[in-house]
Amino acid sequence: MTVFMEDLTQQVVSSASPYVWSLVLAFATVLISIALLYLARFSAKLEVKDLADLRSMFDRFPAWGKRASWAQQNSFEAFSLHAPAALLAAIAALNGQTLPTIASLAAFAYPALRLAYICAYVFNVPLARSLCWLLGLLCSGVLYGVGLSALLA
């Protein structure tokens, strides 16, 4: 009986792993965007007086640093949309629902698209940035749709 339960537990947990990894990797892209922002802050030569008004230092950022700041802000917004979608899909998988392959693809594509989005933003490639943003949003939408339909079935 114990071997059966361990095998069953391993199967259930592994079915949720694409969505959990999506969540972990998506958070890693948020951390990358924060690191780029701090790199921009150091290139703007942070001074003691800036501690009283950090936003005024933004004017001294190089152009790429300003874009890194905007990418970082968007990373928090995008993560707050994606995290519930990934959790919803993970919960559906943990409940024994078999999710379609497109859900796993969307889960793994999302962090890659967010990383590409950040790079496109910092390097000022607006068309690629917009395309990555849209595709990332669609990936989150797929996870919401698949997760909800699996849980409501």
Predicted regions and their residues:
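N-terminal signal-anchor transmembrane alpha helix
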Residues: 14-54
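Short alpha-helical packing/oligomerization segments
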Residues: 84-112
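Juxtamembrane boundary at the C-terminal end of a transmembrane helix
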Residues: 143-153
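Interfacial loop-to-transmembrane junctions
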Residues: 115-139
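Core segments of transmembrane alpha-helices
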Residues: 30, 74-89
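Membrane interfacial helix-start motif at the N-side
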Residues: 12-16, 58-80
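Alpha-helical transmembrane segments of multipass membrane proteins
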Residues: 29-37, 81, 117, 140
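Short, strongly hydrophobic alpha-helical membrane anchors
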Residues: 1-16, 153
